[in-house]
Amino acid sequence: MSIFAAFILAAAVGITEILPVSGSGHLYILAKILGVPVSSGVFLSFRAMICLGTGFAGILFYRTQIWDMLRENLVLLGLLRPAGRQRGVPFARRLGQLLFFSTLPMVPALLLNGLRTRIEQGDGTLAIIAVLLCCSGAVLYYVSRSARGKRNIHQITLADALTAGAVQILSVLPGLSRVALSLSVLLGRGLETSAAVEFAGLMGIPAFLGAGIVQLFGASSGGESFASAPLLILGFALSALAGYFTLRVFTERMAERKPSGFAYWSWGAAILALILFLVSA
């Protein structure tokens, strides 16, 4: 893998993993365009590192909320003293607990990482990605256009968290966007767009980190991976940088708009994947 290819792939995935357009689908499409072998150990290690980089971007962006959630739950466990007298359950404590429960359905999904690898190494992968990108875009378009949610982030429920977490299992398939699916569920259940975007963003952190760790252990590149360490470091850094700034822009824009427009992006990527499939057939 060249430095140019690593730069393009890391930056693109750092952006598309944050947006509701399927980072895995874009990674495979761009790898095919750039001639990067997706079955090589270096590519699998690189994919893991850009996944970890995107997760790190989420930690950096949501660092205040993460610290508040961690602190309040440590207070609950008696490991920290409360800052002052508190009435009721602090919101950060409850949000942290909801985030924990939303992560539970992702555990079996991480074990299905091998399924994604087998799909990506098949002959009809581009066609599968094209179909799934269309489906992901269609769901997001319909739900975000029809939803009239009014509930803010303080009103999110355990059912919201569990449902949004469960639907993330489908994102193991390349072309199905984790963000699009979780946003669609949260919007469909009555959350306002800004609340859905924030909770989906927080949910992405353990999802990215967990997937990155599993993929890193699953990549069997040995010495080849060690020799490509500069590319892996570059991938981590670029995906983290791109992911952080994408989070800033995305959360600001979605405070005033609906995410339905990203469906057109997914459909455009689906057309490109289909063209590549037909050309290579």
Where are these regions (language model features)?
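Multi-pass membrane proteins that catalyze or facilitate reactions on polyprenyl-/lipid-phosphate substrates
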Residues: 1-281
